[in-house]
Regions:
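Glycine-rich flexible loops
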Residues: 4-165
Length: 165
């Protein structure tokens, strides 16, 4: 796997890491490499992981009272079609092994996650799909803040089932 700690995606700066977590070449990998590996190991559809500290999703991850099984109650079809449920992982210090442990438990059934007070993590079957999923998550988080306390028409169970079929 290749991973980038931060900054631009310069191919010369990517870290190459073995499936067991051994650093093979390139820049020193991110301290969060363990949770990337946990997602790859526990979700065969996960071929790419994108983790950001984007404004809207990170702001959402800081709110109290979120449903930890699904932070985003479906109100647009694209959340359902691209991501499904978005579980919340409790706050741990960045790089803490418990992030990887919690994501490993959630990985098989999910492809998008919020790390409490930290930010979003998404998977995809390609880097492009993971980036698209991240964009959808970020824009949906933005909509949540734009809508604020206004009444939202959430999708019904029937509408959600139709989108998943």
């Amino acid at each position: 796997m290749c991973i980038r700690d931060r900054g631009n995606l310069d191919p010369q700066r990517l870290s190459k890491v073995a499936a067991d977590g051994e650093w093979l070449s390139g820049d020193k990998p991110s301290k969060e490499v363990l949770f990337h590996l946990a997602l790859y190991r526990n979700n065969p559809r996960c071929k790419a992981v994108v983790h950001l500290h984007s404004t809207w999703s990170t702001a959402l991850s800081c709110l109290q009272g979120l449903d930890s099984s699904n932070v985003i109650r479906p109100f647009t079809p694209y959340v359902v079609m691209r991501m499904g449920n978005v579980p919340l992982v409790p706050y741990y210090r960045p790089g803490d092994k418990r992030i990887a442990q919690d994501l490993a438990e959630l990985a098989a059934d999910n492809q998008a996650f919020l790390l409490a007070n930290h930010g979003p993590v998404v998977c995809g079957e390609s880097l492009q799909e993971a980036a698209n999923n991240m964009e959808e998550l970020e824009e949906t988080a933005k909509l949540i803040f734009i809508l604020g306390d206004r009444p939202i028409r959430y999708l019904t169970a029937g509408e959600i089932a139709e989108l998943r079929s």
